[in-house]
Amino acid sequence: MGVPYPGQSELVKRKAVASNRLKFNCDYYTQSAEYHKNKKHKFESKKYPGNKFDSNWEVKVYEFCKDHNIPVEYSPDISYPYEYDGKTCTYQPDFLINGKVFEVKGDYFFRINESTGKEEMFCPYRRKEWTEDEYEWRCGRYEAKHRCMIANDVIILRGKDINNLTIEMFA
């Protein structure tokens, strides 16, 4: 193999990605819904302990809703199927707030597509071992997920929204 550890081998890496795509419908276990539901390194609300969140922004939204007696459920039992690359994928939203579905996303997940002039979601993480085709595949999947959100009337909260939360946003 020519590498100190088997996990460093390109062949082993590609087999692992192929296996994860079959089992979890993503390249790495850490991208799977199972991982995010069970991972240890989550954020927690000091004001309302009990839930573990994926980001400080999600904590902020949850605390705002609780502080203002707005019905809120984190990681609700809701999922939306979408197609990408000939496979059915599943999107699970962050919140059900007052009967509406919300997703919290950083601004760094979005860019303007130069050829269409439209905003799209893309993969902001780029690993050196990915080929250009692999990276573009990931970006395409992010945008397919974004289109799924739009098609299902999911409200996307971004930086400007998180920093200016109002009761009216959740009415």
Please provide the spans of the model-predicted regions.
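Nucleic-acid endo/exonuclease domains
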Residues: 1-171
